Curated annotation (Swiss-Prot):
The keyword Transmembrane helix applies. This is UPF0754 membrane protein Lm4b_02251. GO terms for cellular component: plasma membrane. Belongs to the UPF0754 family. It holds the Pfam family DUF445. PANTHER family: UPF0754 MEMBRANE PROTEIN YHEB. The chain crosses the membrane at residues 1-21, 357-377.
Amino acid sequence: MSVLFTILLMAVIGGFIGAMTNYIAIRMLFRPYKAIYLFNKRLPFTPGLIPKRRDELAEHIGKVVVSHLLTEDAIRARLLDENLQKEITDTITKMFHEKMQLETTPNELLHHFGYENAEIRSMTWVEKTLEKEINHFLTTKKTTKMSDLIPTMLESELTTKLPHVTERITSKMTLFVSSEEGKIQIKQMLQKFFEEHGKMGSMARMFINIDSFSEKIQQEGLKLIGQEDTKNLINQLLTTEWKNFEAKELQELIPTEKQAHLAGQLTSELIQTFPHEKLFNQPIQVMLRGYEAAITEKVIPFAVERMLDFVATHSAEIVERMDLAKLVETQIATFSLPEIEKLVVEISGRELKMITYLGGILGGFIGIIQGVLAMWI
């Protein structure tokens, strides 16, 4: 009985020592947090392993993460993953549909981002910028000929339109001369002509019937307008005037002293024409309503694909600039020692307990062997 008791006692003592040894060893990984001094001498194993090697640990973890986990290839592969692209697209599409159910004006949106009086400030800026640019254009281009300012396509289009302008002019002239108003105008001109020539005019009126003479002039005028030579003459005059216009410099048409006034007028007209009140006060959702399907089906998927492709293409540069190793190291360094201890225990608490139990089992087994050997010696 005493032999069995001795062996069991040795087993219990060995198990206790083994378990406590492993328990203390595990605790010494974290504790104490600071060095302990006795008679100005630092006690061995203080501070604990992790507190002592904390900076080295953070640095090495950062390097391991970048070298083996968040590698450029891994990041690129993840960014080009179709599942990720679909997830991001679905998320953005869902957010877009949610926002489309609201009614948010540009004014409200800008106010949300701290931009007060957005409409007034924006239009003031546009007005100043526009007037400045017009003044700059008129100043820098004042010696430039109009032919160089007018776009080639527009110049060609206007040149080809001159015969049509001629046709329109002759058509309007024919319409006016043949009208009752035209007839009255011709009669009034004849009467004025005779009146301006005094007695000779009065004498001529005695032999001429104004009404019939007016009709005759009207008929002859219509014949003259309808002649091809008249059309050619009008077309030639228009062409000549157009060439003269093209040959002029901008400053001939707009003198320097009138530039500022013209710039102000043009700016004012453009600002009044621009529907800024509607733009700033109409809900964005209303403006986008007609394009909602196109945005969700084409724009968002395309934008997500291009964005991920761009990031993947430049992933090496991005990773280098982000310095992920330093980022991980810095983040770990911000953890307090109790937080690090808690994190490790939460992750591997079960395994640490098993190590403690294993120490007890091995200690107990060694105690049994020692008890048996003690009986033989």
